[in-house]
Amino acid sequence: VVQRVFVDANVFVSRTLRDWICLLRAEIPAMFQLHTTEDVLAEALYTLRRNRKDADGGETVHIRQAILESIDEVLADFNGSVAYSGADPDDRHVHAAAVACQADVLLTEDQGFEESDLTPYEVYSCDDFFCLTDDAVPDRVRAVAMKQLKYWNAQPRRKGLKQALIDAGCPDFAERVEGHLRLASGVRPRH
């Protein structure tokens, strides 16, 4: 069964998280679909602009286009008045959209979402979601890790792939990626 994953803005704001979710989606199309809203995209781009005030306009256009190429659905409408018990009232629109698109998973780095028996989706951090994906299809995650390694190795004066994942809040997944890269290089896994 293909999982419907609603992606929150904070995932798109992080280049590392954005790249991984989009690359995993492209590598494993039968496993999950990505859904979001214009509101979430606007929030992500607003935050990106706030964080990088000197970025060229084309940079945000490129980021938006790259996101849209990976998204299966940009939800056009949703009922904003659905019941919501989360800690941040400004996140109501995320919950409402996740409900409207019948998401199985809400992918967010926000700790303010509460799961209950009434919530029709499960809340996952990227670290947890990426690790679950690795549990299901480790060979496909390894393929994405190899693509990512090629990109990161071509970037001068940048931190490594593992450190980027740790800095993005994915320490467990970073360890798994390091294991995939060791395996792909022929180095025996650490015990």
Task: Identify the function of each model-found stretch.
Residues V1-T36:
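Short, well-structured N-terminal submotif of metal-dependent ribonuclease cores
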Residues D8, T37, E109-D110, S125:
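A secondary-structure boundary/capping signal
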Residues D19-C22, R49, T119-V123:
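Short, glycine/charged-enriched secondary-structure capping and boundary segments
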Residues D91-Y124:
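Acidic, metal-binding active-site segment of PIN/NYN-like and related structure-specific nucleases
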Residues Q111-H191:
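Acidic, PIN/NYN-like endoribonuclease modules and their adjacent C-terminal/linker elements
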